[in-house]
Amino acid sequence: MAQKTSGLIQRCRFLLLMILFLPHVMTSSVLSVNGKTENYILDTEPGLQESLKCAVQNHIRDEELLWYREDGRVDLKSGNKINSSSVCVSGISEDDNGITFTCKLQRNQSVSISVVLNVTFPPLLSGNDFQTAEEGSDVKLVCNVKSNPQAQMMWYKNNGILNLENHHQIQQTSEYFQLSITKVKKSDNGTYSCIANSLIETKTKDFHLIVKDKGSTVPIEPIIAACVVVFLTLVFGVIARRKRIMKLCRKDQGPQCRTAL
């Protein structure tokens, strides 16, 4: 009987320990941002303001939260740290596209959740509007482009699709769309249009190319040498003339006498 009672007591102790430790096992803290418990992408636009609210779920004690913008820690007020914390992203611009905001538990920073800003905007085009080139030289028309989503790019010439010739070359990156023309000809004169077509809007920027006649090449060295010869000739001529004048003056000078009348 005593053995049965002892075994029953041990079982009760075991069950009691399981009950005590169960909340710690089942209620591990989970973070959410704006109600989402997984990392996500937030679609937004320039000029808008977005609010991100991070909250601790299943916590059994007060938890301090941290916010990071990329690798930089966000300065939070004292009343905006415990169990829930909000940050406002105001004045969103095109440069904020791809920026990551991360909320972390202070005591265990491996517990975190991130939000990536997806700032959508129409194409922004820029570049040198006017270029003048000498016939036979090389020219680069660089159309700087910024767009999200990425735009489809094309070159037009004088309002028509550009017919690429052997001396034309196109290069495209995520930041620019470039047309290179080697040994430009008179026929390359005209207005070149950089066209960006995105799902939001189509934008155009014009580049005006003026090809001048090839100037005659004048050798500079012979001109300099001729100028030096002329200068030295003039100098020697002046010196020789001065010596001749001085000789004539000496011949004209003789003994002077005073005559009293």
Curated annotation (Swiss-Prot):
The keyword Transmembrane applies. Residues 1-27 form the signal peptide. Keywords: Cell membrane, Cytoplasm, Disulfide bond, Glycoprotein, Immunoglobulin domain, Membrane, Repeat, Signal, Transmembrane, Transmembrane helix. PANTHER family: IRREGULAR CHIASM C-ROUGHEST PROTEIN-RELATED, NEPHRIN. The chain crosses the membrane at residues 220-240. The keyword Magnesium does not apply. It is a single-pass type I membrane protein. Residues 241-261 are cytoplasmic. Glycans are attached at residues 83, 108, 118, 189. May control cell-cell adhesion, cell migration and proliferation, cell morphology, and protects renal epithelial cells from oxidative cell injury to promote cell survival. CDD domains: Ig. It is found in: Cell membrane; Cytoplasm. Residues 28-114, 122-208 form the Ig-like C2-type domain. This is Transmembrane and immunoglobulin domain-containing protein 1. Its main location: membrane. Homodimer. InterPro entries: Cell_adhesion_signaling, Ig-like_dom, Ig-like_dom_sf, Ig-like_fold, Ig_I-set, Ig_sub, Ig_sub2. One of its GO terms (biological process) is regulation of cell migration. N-glycosylated.
